[in-house]
Every structure is written in structure tokens, then in C-alpha cells.
């Protein structure tokens, strides 16, 4: 049984659009992918991002002299249901384990915003200009809120906990720090083949988590969930395992040969690094990996930045500089086969 995933092309790196990247937005481009994998990965990442990234939210509130959500507060423009609705829009970052208590204690006339929230230093308010309520007079207004961490959307508890003080109102919690996720799939080219996928993923957050961290967390969640399926091959018989291991060894060797025979342009290096390799006469990946780092640094215009770039990309293929190879994929016969050298007339 041959391990059929060996020959699938894998994306080399993730590109981030630095011109539009902020704490709240990021666009990530992943290529090349096998045809169909753009939608497969894009949809999976989108669903996990929207449902499973941990955030913080207000889960309950207690307002002085208020016993239930249908009450009103003298001197406050909004009724309690409106205040609760506004509290759901307060975006918070929990800097330690929850739950934590935050509060508002004011008697100034005018607008109350999230900036008026008093914390103990373990909770950060992300949208301080968010509107909560308005006071029409110099009336004292005191409110305590409990903040906790969680995932997704959780409905308010219908029954109060025994340790909750009288007048506590549980509210629905929108924990997710992800506001929106879009993805598009277009064609990508590798060498002369343009039948691959390019996945572009856009992520909007509330600032609780950086977009790139959110994508990384989503990928780790998917990896953990899929890990159990990887072990399914252990249930087959001993004889099949031996055959599979032998097949895997052959497959891995063939796969390595394929990589070494590919042109260095397939690595999609920066223009500077690509020109350095071209000027040094390094055309195939097999030629590149046999060079030592010291040799590469002696190449004209080739610096440590280019070295780091190439090392990172080679590592994704399980390759490195200074490899000792049992064959020479850069000989004349192979180059003729690859179209590198034209036959002499």
C-alpha cells in the first residue's frame, strides 16, 4: 500500500498583505494547492474561525435597585433591556483566567460609554467609544458585570447560580473575537502548470486576537481534530504494515527525486535571491541543496537575508543546505530530459 499523499503538492508559505494588515484585519494568500483544496481548506478554516476561537464577553450584570430585565432606572434614558443589548456589544480582552468583575460607578449627566468601565487590570476594553446608556441628571448609576472567556455564542443561563446575588441578570454571550471571514479561490501557476489553487483568506477581528494568530489557532484546532484519523493505519494486519512501510520508503525516495529535479524557480524566491542563483549557475533544487551555507554566502550579492529565505523554504520540503546525495540529478542526461540542454544538431 503506497502512501498516496506523498505526491500531493503542498503550499510553500503564507503571504500576508502588509499594505492592508492591521490589528483588526488581515489578508492571507496560500499557494499552490492541489485543485479542490482551496475550497476544502478555505471552508474548514472559515467555519473554525467563526465558531471555535476563544474570546471574552460579559455574561451577567447587576444594576443597583434593579431586580429584573423589565425594570427601569430613574434618570436613565434606556430601559434595562436596551442597556443589556448595548452591553453585548462591549468587546473585551481577558488577560488572566476568568471570571472577572468589572463595574461602572458614575453620577455625571450625559453619555456612558465603555470607556467608563472600571477594571482591575486583568480586563482590557477594546472599544471604549461603544455606547451603553445616557443619564439625564446627576443620579448615581452603579453596575457590576461579570466577564468570562469562552467560544462562539452561548445563550444566557435561565437559572441563576446559588452564589449569584439577588438582582443578577444573566445575558447572552458572544465570545467569538472573529467578526467576519471571507475566502476566494483562484488559479495558481507552478512552472508551466496553471491548474493549481490559490486560496485568499480575509479575517476581521475585534482586536482581541491578531488575524494571523486567529488563523494559526484555527489550523491547530483542525490539526488536533484530524490527528485521530491519521492513526487508522495501525489497525491493519502486520503483513500489510510491512508492505506499507516498504512502499512508503520507495515512495518517499521517488518523491525526493521529484523535488530535487525541479527548477529553483518553483521555490518562488524573491527576485534578488532568484537572480543570485541564476548568476551562480544553480538551476535545479538538487544543485542548491548540495551547496553549503558558507559556499552560498560567497556567491555575489547573496547575503544572509537570502540565505534565511531559502533555508526556510527548503525546510518545508524537508531539505537543507550541505546535503550529501547518493545521486547527481544535475548531470547532462537529466538536464536533457528536463529540457535544460537542447540536443546538438
From Swiss-Prot:
Transmembrane spans: none
Q: Name one GO molecular function term.
A: DNA binding
Could you tell me which residues belong to the region Alpha C-terminal domain (alpha-CTD)? 256-345
Instruction: Give the CC-aspect GO terms.
Output: cytoplasm; DNA-directed RNA polymerase complex
Q: Keywords in UniProt for this one? A: DNA-directed RNA polymerase, Nucleotidyltransferase, Transcription, Transferase
- InterPro entries per the UniProt record, alphabetical: DNA-dir_RNA_pol_insert (IPR011262), DNA-dir_RNA_pol_RpoA/D/Rpb3 (IPR011263), DNA-dir_RpoA (IPR011773), RBP11-like (IPR036603), RNAP_asu_C (IPR011260), RNApol_insert_sf (IPR036643)
Which Pfam families does this UniProt record tie to the protein? RNA_pol_A_bac (PF01000), RNA_pol_A_CTD (PF03118), RNA_pol_L (PF01193)
Enzyme Commission number: 2.7.7.6
> Where are the annotated segments for Alpha N-terminal domain (alpha-NTD)?
1-233
The GO annotation for biological process reads:
DNA-templated transcription
Q: Which CDD domains does the entry link to?
A: RNAP_alpha_NTD
Catalytic reaction list: RNA(n) + a ribonucleoside 5'-triphosphate = RNA(n+1) + diphosphate
Q: How does it assemble?
A: Homodimer. The RNAP catalytic core consists of 2 alpha, 1 beta, 1 beta' and 1 omega subunit. When a sigma factor is associated with the core the holoenzyme is formed, which can initiate transcription.
Q: Which family does it belong to?
A: Belongs to the RNA polymerase alpha chain family.
Tell me the domain comment: The N-terminal domain is essential for RNAP assembly and basal transcription, whereas the C-terminal domain is involved in interaction with transcriptional regulators and with upstream promoter elements.
Under the heading NCBIfam families, the entry gives: PRK05182.1-2, PRK05182.2-5, rpoA
- Explain the purpose of this protein: DNA-dependent RNA polymerase catalyzes the transcription of DNA into RNA using the four ribonucleoside triphosphates as substrates.
Q: What is this protein called?
A: DNA-directed RNA polymerase subunit alpha
Q: Which organism is it from?
A: Syntrophus aciditrophicus (strain SB)
Amino acid at each position: 500500500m503506497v502512501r498516496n499523499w506523498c505526491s500531493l503538492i503542498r503550499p510553500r508559505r503564507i503571504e500576508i498583505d502588509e499594505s492592508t494588515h492591521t490589528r483588526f484585519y488581515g489578508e492571507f494568500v496560500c499557494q499552490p494547492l492541489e485543485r479542490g483544496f482551496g475550497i476544502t481548506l478555505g471552508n474548514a478554516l472559515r467555519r473554525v474561525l467563526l465558531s471555535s476561537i476563544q474570546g471574552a464577553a460579559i455574561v451577567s450584570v447587576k444594576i443597583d435597585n434593579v431586580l429584573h430585565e423589565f425594570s427601569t432606572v430613574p434618570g436613565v434614558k434606556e430601559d434595562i433591556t436596551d442597556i443589556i443589548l448595548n452591553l453585548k456589544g462591549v468587546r473585551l480582552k481577558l488577560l488572566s483566567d476568568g471570571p472577572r468583575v468589572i463595574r461602572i460607578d458614575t453620577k455625571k449627566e450625559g453619555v456612558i460609554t465603555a470607556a467608563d468601565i472600571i477594571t482591575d487590570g486583568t480586563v482590557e476594553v477594546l472599544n471604549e467609544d461603544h455606547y451603553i446608556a445616557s443619564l439625564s441628571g446627576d443620579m448615581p448609576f452603579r453596575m457590576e458585570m461579570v466577564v468570562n472567556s469562552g467560544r462562539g455564542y452561548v445563550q444566557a443561563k435561565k437559572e441563576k447560580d446559588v452564589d449569584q446575588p439577588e438582582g443578577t441578570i444573566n445575558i447572552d454571550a458572544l465570545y467569538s473575537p472573529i467578526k467576519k471571514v471571507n475566502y476566494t479561490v483562484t488559479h495558481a501557476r507552478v512552472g508551466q502548470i496553471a491548474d493549481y489553487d490559490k486560496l485568499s483568506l480575509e479575517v476581521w477581528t475585534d482586536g482581541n486576537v491578531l488575524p494571523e494568530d486567529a488563523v494559526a489557532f484555527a489550523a491547530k484546532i483542525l490539526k488536533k481534530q484530524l490527528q485521530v484519523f491519521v492513526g487508522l493505519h495501525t489497525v491493519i494486519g502486520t503483513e500489510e504494515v510491512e508492505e506499507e512501510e516498504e512502499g512508503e520508503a520507495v515512495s518517499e525516495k521517488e518523491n525526493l527525486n521529484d523535488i530535487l529535479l525541479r527548477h529553483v524557480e518553483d521555490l518562488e524566491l524573491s527576485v534578488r535571491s532568484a537572480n543570485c542563483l541564476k548568476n551562480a549557475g544553480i538551476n535545479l533544487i538538487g544543485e542548491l541543496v548540495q551547496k553549503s551555507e558558507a559556499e552560498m554566502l560567497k556567491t555575489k550579492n547573496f547575503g544572509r537575508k537570502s540565505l534565511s529565505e531559502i533555508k526556510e523554504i527548503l525546510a518545508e520540503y524537508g531539505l537543507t543546505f550541505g546535503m550529501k546525495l547518493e545521486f547527481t540529478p544535475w548531470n547532462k542526461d537529466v538536464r536533457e530530459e528536463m529540457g535544460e540542454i537542447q540536443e546538438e544538431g
